[in-house]
Amino acid sequence: GFVKRLTAAALERTRHDVRYDGAYQSIPYPGGDVPSGVGVCTDVLVRSYRALGIDLQREVHEDMAASFSVYPRRWGLSAPVPNIDHRRVPNLEVFFARHGERLPVTDDPADYVPGDLVSWMVGPLPHLGIVVPVRSSDGARFQVVHNIGRGPELEDMLFDYPVVGHFRYYGPGDAQR
């Protein structure tokens, strides 16, 4: 099913050597990506979904073009920018809530299942990862694939930072598969 393919794509990302770099870059649209050797937390999700044929760059840009006012205004922009919008955690949080499912934020590990998307605040910085079907060493929770600066990695870090968002997104026309 979808979740199995998405989490396999996320786990596959951990085999890539990626230098953490969120610098603005001009990229093609649609289907654009920064060079494969660089990336940030959002690129783990963008590349995982793209492996399933879902272009978050296009999906986010089209939604922002249609509903720009519902997206955060943190960057002083007056219109969507397809080079960077899909690489910003706050934009993805809005997109996933609008086109997927926003789930309750809890401190119960049983509420976070493979395929779920989780956002945290790491100090003042937003962060995003994907829950995968690999249990923590104590079996208490699923682990997360994310990139917090060391490249894409599998880590038992679900509750290491304050959880601020919890989502599911199964692609365009998400039918809560």
Question: Over which residues does each language-model region extend?
Answer:
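Acidic helix/loop microenvironments that form the catalytic cleft of cell-wall polysaccharide enzymes
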Residues: 38, 120, 148-150
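Low-complexity, Gly/Ser/Thr/Pro-rich intrinsically disordered linker/tail segments
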Residues: 139-177
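A generic structural signal for short, solvent-exposed coil/turn residues
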Residues: 48, 121-123, 136, 158-161
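N-terminal capping segments
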Residues: 1-95, 101
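Intrinsically disordered, low-complexity N-terminal regions enriched in serine/proline/glycine
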Residues: 19, 23, 48, 111, ...
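A structural signal for short, hydrophobic beta-strand segments that form beta-sheets
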Residues: 56-57, 131, 162-165
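...with weaker cross-activation on analogous glycine-rich loops/strands in unrelated enzymes
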Residues: 65-145
